[in-house]
Amino acid sequence: MGLEEKLPSGVLLTTVEQIVGFVRKTSMWPATFGLACCAIEMMAAGGPRFDIARFGMERFSATPRQADLMIVAGRVSQKMAPVLRTIYDQMAEPKWVIAMGVCASSGGMFNNYAIVQGVDHIVPVDIYLPGCPPRPEMLLDAILKLHDKVQNTKLGVHREREIEELEQRRLRALPLIQQTEEATR
């Protein structure tokens, strides 16, 4: 006497969104965007000690067209910002971004005119990972938190609306240099 015998054939006890969420979270391919010392810790997470493959990330993708997760590890210069945006735009939907380290999250410990003060001014960020540099264990924890977010992601029109809201929020955010200029006026 199992559940299958009690229910008529063809009955599914879950939603399509839950199935799709499970499949997406267990088969992510990250595109690496390592720019500084955080990239060393990201590479360590791919090694046998931390084994990122057990979470469905069998390989890091060298091409953005085959990736659905971008891990920005390190500081982004003003000249590198358009390249980052181009790579993000080339990624297939749905796509997620982890800002790994203080430099990617907020520009680092120095307010430098040549450094973007947080990659969220360029691309919408889903998970911010603090640390200088964050340990591989922290990256794995951030990936697990992202898995929870992916599991509960809406599909179709609801996802498009969510992406549009994130993009509008990103466009409204001023870079730190412009915030400083406005404060001195």
Swiss-Prot record:
Its cofactor is [4Fe-4S] cluster. One of its GO terms (molecular function) is NADH dehydrogenase (ubiquinone) activity. It is a peripheral membrane protein. GO terms for biological process: aerobic respiration; electron transport coupled proton transport. InterPro entries: NADH_UbQ_OxRdtase-like_20kDa, NADH_UQ_OxRdtase_20Kd_su. It holds the Pfam family Oxidored_q6. It is found in: Cell membrane. This is NADH-quinone oxidoreductase subunit B. It comes from Thermobifida fusca (strain YX).
